[in-house]
């Protein structure tokens, strides 16, 4: 696993796993981490395991709707990373999944599929392909994880109204949406 780190202090209390968007790298989220200046956080920023079809950068999912999607390497990577974060001294309830675009979609699908509650999930400009599947596959424990969905109105790639619809559906199904 290729991993980058960022922290503002020597005694972080919260771990933030920063998941880049499509064609990103382990360096993509560092400017975000720096600009947020969260004194109590240590950022873990992994590189997605699949090479992007564009030839530049990396992707969390590989394949297509026709041929099927490869995600096993991604979920194995996150399982390993969560274990590393916990070995570094962070409890599950002090771990935040923060993802941008495709990384935001991953933060939701992974974070809601695990069998425990996290400190939070923050998807930014995330695209949720199958909202009903996401809702139905969530564990009872992960449904309690607070989710802060962020999406700008001027997004030319992912329509922000889809995020509003997904957030409303999730809230109606008992998720902790903010």
PLM regions: where:
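Serine-hydrolase catalytic machinery in alpha/beta-hydrolase-like enzymes
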Residues: 1-92
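The conserved beta1-alpha1 loop
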Residues: 17-21, 125, 151-152
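Short alpha-helix in the alpha/beta-hydrolase fold that links the catalytic acid
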Residues: 29-32, 159-169
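Gly/Ala-rich beta-loop-alpha elbow adjacent to hydrolase catalytic centers
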Residues: 98-103, 107
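A conserved short beta-strand
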Residues: 116-128
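Acidic catalytic loop of the alpha/beta-hydrolase fold
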Residues: 130, 154-159
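Short beta-strand/loop motif that positions the catalytic acidic residue
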Residues: 143, 148-151, 155
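Catalytic histidine neighborhood in serine/cysteine hydrolases
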Residues: 167-178
């Amino acid at each position: 696993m290729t991993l980058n780190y960022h922290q503002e202090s020597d005694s972080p209390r919260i771990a933030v796993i920063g998941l880049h968007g499509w064609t990103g790298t382990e360096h993509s989220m560092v400017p975000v981490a720096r600009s947020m200046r969260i004194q109590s956080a240590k950022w873990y920023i992994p590189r997605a395991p699949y090479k992007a079809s564009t030839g530049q950068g990396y992707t969390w999912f590989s394949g297509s709707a026709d041929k099927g999607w490869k995600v096993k390497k991604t979920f194995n990577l996150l399982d390993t990373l969560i274990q590393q974060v916990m070995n570094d001294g962070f409890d599950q309830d002090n771990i935040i999944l923060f993802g941008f675009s495709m990384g935001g979609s991953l933060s939701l699908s992974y974070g809601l599929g695990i069998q425990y509650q996290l400190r939070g999930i923050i998807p930014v400009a995330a695209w949720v392909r199958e909202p009903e599947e996401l809702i139905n596959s969530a564990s009872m424990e992960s449904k309690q994880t607070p989710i802060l969905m962020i999406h700008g109105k001027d997004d030319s790639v992912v329509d922000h109204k889809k995020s509003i619809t997904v957030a409303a559906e999730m809230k109606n199904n008992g998720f902790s949406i903010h």
